[in-house]
């Protein structure tokens, strides 16, 4: 999450209060309080914000495999099952279902208490070879010279 916040932009704005509860290979769980910024016109949690949580949650689950970058989305679908509103605490559970050579498939379930609020599937093009090359290039960069001596 530090990398998401450091980059700034939309994800950092939407999830500035996100707290990771679990991060293991292929599985990430986090929580975030619903504030007024995340509501729709009738006071419910906005579907676009929940969809973005599916996007970011799936990406974090992919990143848990050691990817420096998580590629680009090729498909995202969300089913909205129940309402939640301001003051509720949202918990998301994101899992990698399959990590193929070029595509990663994830599922993200979003809860408010015991209530399943939304569930989504997120597919990303992962370009494993490009990611490996980027990691190797970063590892081969020489350390900056120490000029303070």
Region locations from a protein language model:
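Terminal targeting signals and extreme-terminal segments of soluble enzymes
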Residues: 1-149
């Amino acid at each position: 999450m530090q990398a998401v916040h450091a980059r700034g932009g939309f994800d950092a704005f939407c999830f500035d209060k996100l707290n990771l509860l679990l991060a293991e290979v292929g599985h990430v769980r986090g929580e975030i309080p619903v504030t007024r910024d995340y509501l729709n016109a009738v006071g419910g949690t906005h579907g676009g914000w929940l969809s973005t949580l599916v996007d970011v949650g799936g990406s974090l689950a992919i990143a848990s495999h050691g990817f420096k970058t998580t590629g680009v989305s090729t498909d995202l679908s969300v089913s909205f099952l129940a309402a939640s509103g301001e003051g509720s605490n949202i918990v998301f559970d994101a899992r990698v279902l399959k990590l193929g050579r070029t595509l990663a498939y994830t599922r993200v379930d979003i809860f408010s208490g015991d209530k399943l609020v939304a569930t989504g599937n997120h597919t990303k093009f992962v370009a494993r070879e490009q990611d490996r090359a980027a990691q190797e290039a970063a590892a081969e960069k020489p350390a900056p010279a120490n000029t303070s001596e």
